[in-house]
Amino acid sequence: MIKNLFLFLTLFTVLPLQANTVESILENGMKIIVREDHRAPVVASQVWYRIGSTYEYDGITGVSHVLEHMMFKGTKKLKPGDFSEIIAANGGSDNAFTSHDFTGYHQRIASDRLEICLELEADRMRNVIFLQEEFNKELAVVQEERRWRVDNKPKSKLFEQFYATAFLSSPKRIPVIGWMGDLESLEMKDAADWYQQ
């Protein structure tokens, strides 16, 4: 009885949330999902790319995460760091993440500033530039992230080795942050080529 009540209440609370969601596909194939919520004059804008560690292969593991960092390092219009500075100057915040299957970029900003986010995302979707100095900095940051999150934590190292063994013939064996050996040999061209895909 309690199980059925829980299921009913769960459905009852989830169904109204779905009612305000609209999904459409643009001519270029990009899927747009909009969920309206007018409780506050704020918008959360997210762009997700179907790229992550499961698309990588030995020799370039970690390239999706490095590219995530490079997406903040300038375009034909913007200098390194300008993207986040523009969002912050308009009262917003931004960040990004890489997973096995997706890489996402998100901003939270006043709803009357949504156009700024969309213009910035459209720019970096097509116009990221790769500067060797910026690449070297970000590669070092990702390597340090790996040391901090995995190499210096026995439990994390254990789970990484477990996944590598359990998913031996699956791309899920590749850690999102990449193998340190691959990160040490990764070149800017690898990230630039990954971006062009």
Would you name each region that the model predicts?
Residues 4-16:
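Bacterial N-terminal signal peptides
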Residues 49, 75-76, 82-194:
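Acidic/histidine-enriched segments that form metal/cofactor-coordinating
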Residues 17-84, 106-109, 115-125, 192-197:
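His/Glu-rich zincin catalytic helix
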Residues 10, 72, 152:
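Active-site-proximal flexible loops/turns
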Residues 7, 68-71, 141, 148:
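Hydrophobic side chains within alpha-helical segments
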Residues 9-12, 21, 34, 170-172:
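Intrinsically disordered, low-complexity segments enriched in polar/charged residues with Gly/Pro
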